[in-house]
Amino acid sequence: AALCTLEAKNEKFPLYKDAKVPMEKRVEDLLSRMTMEEKVLQLSQYVAGRNTNANNIGEEVKNIPAEIGALLYYSTSPGLRNNIQKKAMEESRLGIPVLFGHDVIHGFRTVYPISIAQACSWNPTLVEKACGMAAREARLAGLDWTFSPVIVVARDPRWGRVSEGYGEDPYTNGVFAAASVKGYQGDNLADGKHIAACLKHYIGYGASEAGRDYVYT
């Protein structure tokens, strides 16, 4: 009887939800429970928050699958974010929370110089501090993740996204990208003051031809 009670308790509170268990074991347990469809949805991203009509917020939440992994989030509404997260936690089979991401590239509420101008400072320590402040502002707005820094080695000034990177020198790109990641993520992503970074874009993206975006890369 005691064994049955213990098994029933474990079923209600699975290992992957136990914060005292090492992260690797929690991830392994969670993955073992997931269906292929759930794994695919965790690798998918929807867009939310562009519809600012209050009457349509419910419709927007309804159209987002409860099992979605992440959102490109444009809203500043705590209500919309909380409703989406509530749906993910309560209506999905495994209760996996959603990651809310946004392009926090050169500041969030406080706007700093664009990345190529940051590189002109030759001051990665200052850039780290700026990214740290941007992370804090973004986290307070309910974001977990930024699609930054942009690491593109500029090869053609006609390309419209040159300004998003740190110039034409690979070493400079590396130094400032590292500083940015340190600023965004800090030493502890769970401290409520930092967000996850995302190095982008895919390898070779900056090697555009004739300045055209996406065409050959």
Protein language model annotation of sequence segments:
Residues 2-217:
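Glycoside hydrolase catalytic-domain context in secreted enzymes
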